[in-house]
Amino acid sequence: MLTSRVTDLRGFLIGRLPVRIGLTQSNLDRAEEYLLDISHPKSPNYGKVWTSEEVIAAFRPSESAIEAVTDWLASHGIIDVTHSENKGWLAFDAPASKVEALLQTVYYEHEDQITGGVAPACDKYHVPKKIQEHIDYITPGTKLMAPVKSDVDLKVKREGQKNRRHDRVKQPAKQKFSEQLFNLLSSNSSDLSTCDVAITPACVAALYNITAGTLCVPNNSLGIFEAELQYWDQQDLDLFFANFTDWIPQGTHPIDEEIDGGIAQTDNISLAGGESMLDLQLAYPIVYPQTITVLNVDDIHYQTWENDTYTWGFNTLLDAIDGSYCTYSAYNETGDLPNWDPTYPDPGPDGYNGTLQCGVFEPPNVISLSYGGQEADVPISYQKRQCNEYLKLGLQGVTFVFASGDSGVSNYPEPYGFDGPTGCLGPDLNIFNPTWPNNCPWLTNVGATKVYPGFTVFEPESAAFDPGRVNYSSGGGFSNVYPIPDYQKAAVDLFFQDHEPGYPYYEGLVPDADNYTLPNVTALAGNTGGIYNRIGRGIPDVAANGDNIAVFVGGEFGLSGGTSASTPIFAGIINRINDERLAIGKSPVGFINPVLYEHPEVLNDITNGTNPGCGTDGFSAVPGWDPVTGLGTPNYPKMLELFLSLP
């Protein structure tokens, strides 16, 4: 955020500053251990999910840290200090002169050159060395700086072009097809002979051996995240049900959870969203009679925000689920990040005029999210703070299922994407460009497969590739921010041992950084000539069908696709498994990756196809895990049997 100094606050020493001190959390070095303890199938504590109170207690700052900081404040005459409910904050108001003496600094008012807002800040502040280890962040603190330019910005100068780095993982491309094809598909909705042309619910059921659902266990509604004006409409749902799933009654619709001004539904069929209709029309045939809850976040102003750093409202969702996240301090960042996240109340004409919703609803056990961007375009601290929250919710039994992206090992090239002419990184624009937020190790991310022309649902699928859709292929690769997690290491090691990709590589992870610093992949790769990171978290974990999906949008029949389609399929299957476990008194499955990597036999291994990008063929789908289709596609009966066998 660009700022300019406006007023020296030394002229207003009688004024009071609201000060918040974010305390360093304890036990973050044990977070992975805690999560694996309840999610690894060999652990005696498998399935013993934590409460939110237990999570707060496990990571709260130590008593010695709290005592050290409060004693330091008291030595400067600051005694009236409040300790936040989430235990991560100390808060007090004090005269500006006293705060300046405490921190050995001078406060000024700084004006945001973008918004015109004015806030107190300083150029630097001092904390005694013995106190530093206990403090993560102090606000008001140093003025916020503009984001470091990305690799692509350094190479490609865009004149007069808006840089929408965080384009949806893939805007489902709804292709219109002939009335003859529609009549053929709808006249016999159980016909499997045309699944290489169009994927219907019958095709999905046949591919993954999914039986009809019978359970509707309370408090197990499947969560589907939507943003970017992706509204659902009843008319399209009813058209789909009538033609392809006549066992689902007309009028069946999701529950709307509208967060901070979000709008989930429209009565205007012309405003129906391709993403939302795709998600619902894939998920309903799998989970029905179980319900679906649409989680729509942020007001119209932010959903159409021209600021290219809007990050889909994931933090808005997490704030609404976990109130402590609203003020959670980590990696020198506290709460939502200005100019990246919305600020509420929003007084604009389309704004949500209420306060930020914090901890207002219980999360679904499974949440499907078909949105995202590129890892290199999101601040390091922002990513890691958010990733911590996914882990904490995993401890509470929540499964997050993300799409892996639709442009292979790169982003879409211009003009379809906004990471330069190749969609790749580095000075030569040839370094692979992994996606976010599915780079976080505590999520399950889903690649895409396809029934190739001339093949049937009774034969193995292949990795999705459709050159007619801007070279759409299954997103995959290796993170530059996170290391290979323990649960994945054996599978990744075997991939490199048996299926060496043959490309030059580099090894390293970007260091932690403050505020708006982006991952510098050029510096990370150095002079190695490498085009991918050999030691990063592998993407994706699993896969499901993601091309030629039959869908109704805006009253019209067409075909759609993307990992946006694969994700609700896989999430729906996990939700079905939760129904079965909950019905017999067991916990939801929560973080599923350790179980799947320990038991890859419950998935259909995909061994054909690639995910091209950056002037290469990308990686190849091979026996075992690979960075194209992960461990493979779901086999519902095998997965159900396995998860029911666990405590």
Predicted regions and their residues:
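Substrate-binding/charge-relay-adjacent region of secreted/lumenal peptidase catalytic domains
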Residues: 1-82, 91, 96-402, 406-408, ...
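Active-site glycine-centered loops adjacent to acidic/histidine catalytic or metal-binding residues
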Residues: 405, 562, 630
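Active-site environment of divalent metal-dependent phosphoester hydrolases
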Residues: 409-410, 452
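Histidine/acidic-residue-rich catalytic or RNA/ligand-binding cores of hydrolases
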Residues: 413-416
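Polar, glycine-rich mid-to-C-terminal structural blocks
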Residues: 441, 445-495
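An often Trp-containing, charged/polar helix-loop segment at the C-terminal end
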Residues: 516, 529, 574, 578-629, ...
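C-terminal substrate/ligand-recognition segments
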Residues: 540, 561-579
